Amino acid sequence: MTSFAQTVFYVLAGLFNVFLLYFRKTNRAYCKYQVVKYHSNIPMSPLTTHRLLTVKRKILVLDLDETLIHSHHDGVLRQTVKPGTPSDFTIRVVIDRHPVKFSVHERPHVDYFLTVVSQWYELVVFTASMEVYGSSVADKLDRGRGILKRRYFRQHCTMEVGGYTKDLSAIHPDLSSICILDNSPGAYRKFPHNAIPIPSWFSDPNDTCLLNLLPFLDALRFTSDVRSVLSRNMQVLPETQTVQYY
């Protein structure tokens, strides 16, 4: 192959890679909005409004990794994420005196999900990751709205065989008004009747789990005790699924 032909080949290959990157980013943006949104602003009847006033405002505890986001650092890419997939944002933190860059992918519809549920619940972030990482991710997801102010990190977890567990009573002593959304059953093994299971997410741009939860969460806030509903949930996800912590 002549030098001219090689130059043409490299130019075309570069243009193709740019086009492919743009297509993936555009497709992800499209997938986020192709599903009909949940109509959360429909006026409630006087009876419904009265019912809501008679129960306590609930607390929704949110996990981060593989629940709301997926991240990888400095070229370490899971097989489930296609090489070249653009991240939604990056964060730079110092871990053990070493600077580390994380590329973070947001689960589809996470921003809309947080906007809606923050009107219904007090939101609390509880991650088994280190504070320097988890706090930076929470800041990005909050987008300056002040809806993710309360945060708990690895130092607030209990290390047991099989991983970290999260003590919900440390967030609020009244367990009747608190629920946790987490992809790891081990994290809430001591509070199974307060748990809302969700499949782990890594890269699927067509995922709608967060959207699908909105009608359920809308109804759950009217209960006097969330455990009366969540204890009936038989959809227990395998406890052996892989969880990564930073």
Curated annotation (Swiss-Prot):
Protein EC: 3.1.3.16
Topology in membrane: Single-pass membrane protein
Major enzyme class: hydrolase
Highest taxon above the source species: Eukaryota
GO molecular function: phosphoprotein phosphatase activity; protein serine/threonine phosphatase activity
Span of domain FCP1 homology: 53-220
Subcellular location: Membrane
A single BP term in Gene Ontology: nuclear envelope organization
Catalysed reactions, as listed in the record: O-phospho-L-seryl-[protein] + H2O = L-seryl-[protein] + phosphate; O-phospho-L-threonyl-[protein] + H2O = L-threonyl-[protein] + phosphate
Short name of one Pfam family: NIF
Annotated keywords: Hydrolase, Membrane, Protein phosphatase, Transmembrane, Transmembrane helix
Bilayer-crossing regions: 3-23
GO cellular component: cytoplasm; endoplasmic reticulum membrane; Nem1-Spo7 phosphatase complex; nuclear envelope; nuclear membrane
NCBIfam families linked to this entry: HIF-SF_euk (TIGR02251)
Stated family: Belongs to the dullard family.
Function: Serine/threonine protein phosphatase that may dephosphorylate and activate lipin-like phosphatases. Lipins are phosphatidate phosphatases that catalyze the conversion of phosphatidic acid to diacylglycerol and control the metabolism of fatty acids at different levels. May indirectly modulate the lipid composition of nuclear and/or endoplasmic reticulum membranes and be required for proper nuclear membrane morphology and/or dynamics. May also indirectly regulate the production of lipid droplets and triacylglycerol.
Protein name stated in the entry: CTD nuclear envelope phosphatase 1 homolog
